[in-house]
C-alpha cells in the first residue's frame, strides 16, 4: 500500500512539473514567435564594456574584462539574431570608442559615444555586458543593475537576474540593483541594464568566465531572460550594491 501511495505521489509531482514547465516553455515560445514573426523586428543594442586600451577589470590570473565582455556579447548577438532580432553592437572588435585625437577624458568620450550609438539606434532596450571586481575575493555571482527611475529597466533586470540564477548559478542570492549614478544608466534614452556576469576577482569564477563554454552559457541565459521580459514577466527589486564597472 505504501508503495502504491508513493507511486501516486510521484506521478502527481511529474504531472505538475510537466504542466508548470510546459506553460513556461509555451510563454517563452510565444515571445520568440512574436519577436521573430512580427512586421517590425525588435531592435536591441548590445554594449560590451571597455575595449582597446581600456581592459576594464583584470582577473586574479590575468583574464581581461574587455575580452570576456566582447565574447559574451557576440554569442548573445548570435542568439538574438537567430530569433529575428535586429542587433546593433556598440563595438564588435577589441577597440575603444574614443577618437585617436583624444588626449584627456578618454573614458568620458568613450561612454558618450556609446550613448550616441544607442540614441541613434532607437532600440527597444539595451544590454550592457560587464564583469565585476571587488577588493574581497570571496564575492561571486552575476548581478544586474538598472536605472532607479526606470520601471521597464527594473522589469528587464528582474527577468535577467532570475534567469541567470536559474540557468547559471542556483546558489547565487543576488537581486537586481537600482542605481542613479552610472553614466550609461542615467543617459540612455531606452530601457537599459548592466549585466555584471561575475567576479574576476574570485579565483573560481574567473576560471569559468575565461572559458568559451561558460561565456556561451551566460549569453544563452541572458537571451532567455530577454524572452521573459518581452513576454511581460518580471518586476523590480532592490538589494545590496557591490562595486561595478
PLM regions and their residue ranges:
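Catalytic-site microenvironment of enzymes
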Residues: 1-245
Amino acid at each position: 500500500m505504501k508503495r502504491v501511495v508513493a507511486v501516486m505521489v510521484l506521478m502527481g509531482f511529474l504531472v505538475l512539473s510537466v504542466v508548470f514547465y510546459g506553460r513556461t516553455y509555451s510563454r517563452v515560445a510565444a515571445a520568440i514567435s512574436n519577436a521573430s514573426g512580427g512586421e517590425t523586428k525588435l531592435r536591441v543594442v548590445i554594449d560590451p564594456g571597455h575595449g582597446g586600451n581600456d581592459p576594464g577589470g583584470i582577473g586574479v590570473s590575468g583574464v581581461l574584462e574587455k575580452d570576456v565582455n566582447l565574447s559574451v556579447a557576440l554569442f548573445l548577438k548570435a542568439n538574438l539574431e537567430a530569433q529575428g532580432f535586429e542587433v546593433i553592437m556598440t563595438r564588435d572588435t577589441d577597440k575603444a570608442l574614443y577618437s585617436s585625437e583624444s588626449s584627456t577624458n578618454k573614458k568620458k568620450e568613450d561612454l558618450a559615444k556609446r550613448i550616441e550609438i544607442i540614441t541613434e539606434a532607437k532600440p527597444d532596450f539595451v544590454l550592457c555586458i560587464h564583469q565585476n571586481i571587488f577588493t574581497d575575493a570571496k564575492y561571486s555571482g552575476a548581478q544586474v543593475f538598472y536605472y532607479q527611475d526606470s520601471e521597464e529597466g527594473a522589469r528587464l533586470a528582474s527577468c535577467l537576474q532570475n534567469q541567470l540564477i536559474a540557468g547559471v548559478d542556483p546558489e547565487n542570492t543576488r537581486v537586481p540593483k537600482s542605481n542613479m549614478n552610472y553614466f550609461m544608466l542615467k543617459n540612455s534614452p531606452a530601457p537599459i541594464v548592466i549585466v555584471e556576469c561575475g567576479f574576476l576577482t574570485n579565483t573560481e569564477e574567473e576560471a569559468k568566465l575565461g572559458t568559451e563554454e561558460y561565456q556561451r552559457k551566460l549569453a544563452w541565459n541572458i537571451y532567455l531572460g530577454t524572452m521573459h521580459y518581452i513576454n511581460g514577466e518580471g518586476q523590480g527589486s532592490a538589494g545590496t550594491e557591490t562595486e561595478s564597472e
